[in-house]
Amino acid sequence: MKLLKAELLLNGGKLEEAQWLLSTIADADELETIIDVVFLYLDMGYPDAAKEWLDRGKSRYTEDEEYMALTADYLASTHQVESAIIYYNKLIDKSPFNPSYWMGLVKCYFVQEQIDKAIEACDFALAADDQYGEAYAYKAHCFFYLNNSDDAIENYQKAIELKAIPPELGYMFMGISYGNKEEWQKADDYYDKVIERFEEDGDKQSILLIDTYTSKAFALSHLERYEEAHELCEKAKEINPNEGLIYLTEGKLYLAEELEDEAAISFEKAIEINPNIEMWYMIASAYSESDYLIEAKEYFEKVYQINPKYEDVTEKLSVLCLMHGEINNFFKYNKECEHPLEEDMILDLLNSPEHREEDERTLKEVWERMKKENKKKTKGKK
């Protein structure tokens, strides 16, 4: 009863009153009580108060498995990932067939983007319990992260079957995965499943539907069902007319229809709503993917002005400058690339039968300049 009252107080932001109430619990030093209170504070967003209660049991329960699990979960929840990994490994040494400990490890590795280790830990969790749905869900997320669409789809399906992930979320990821495989009809089918779930729940105005409508619209554009795609963008605007993603998608649709002026207007609206670097980059990429290279270069240049180290913007600009015969700008951006084009790569392009005839003069000039610069570097080292 006191835990429930404390939760209500914390919901109202009355931390001190909740702390006093919890301090009056008769069995406050019992491990079960400590566990309940620590998770209450963590769930309500009070990690410092949770730490006080965690420390309360330290001297008495240090080697107790439940207390160690609580400590590991606390460390993971407060982003002390390396320390959490140490505790989860200790717990696994004690109980190697406990899938929840393996899942704790999975989540830590996933946060660290050590995806191969996360997948391996998922496999150990499933070896302990092949019906442990959360392991399938995280394994799916890992494969999705790696752009391994086939394995992601398989694991999302299993996670949905085991009720480890909301179906609408699983279907959304499956739709995106099919889109990554360019299987647009299957992608569209799964977006329909997401929409059906929201409609069944009577939640037709959910902001989550914006992502679904725009993703479905993009899939429909590849199926050349442009009118339906634009209708979906309008439905998304009814939910939130100030969402830049809608206008980004709309711009992509217009590019697919070769309506450059309309695309430009939509992209300008997207920037007006979300003038962040990510939006500039996504618009540049949309132009690039549709072979509007002059516009792509303009938008990538804006990205570079905001942050020269953003994503692979220097790589994009170096290639575009090369294609446009802007040799000085090519060298400027190429020098800043993490993996710059080297002399041998330019020679390969020159020798390739696939290079454009109009590029030959530029490539030869770049190659000759690279040779001279490399000779100077070699002499300087002697």
Question: PLM features: what roles do these ranges have?
Answer:
Residues 28-30, 62, 96, 130, ...:
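Short coil turns that delineate tetratricopeptide repeat
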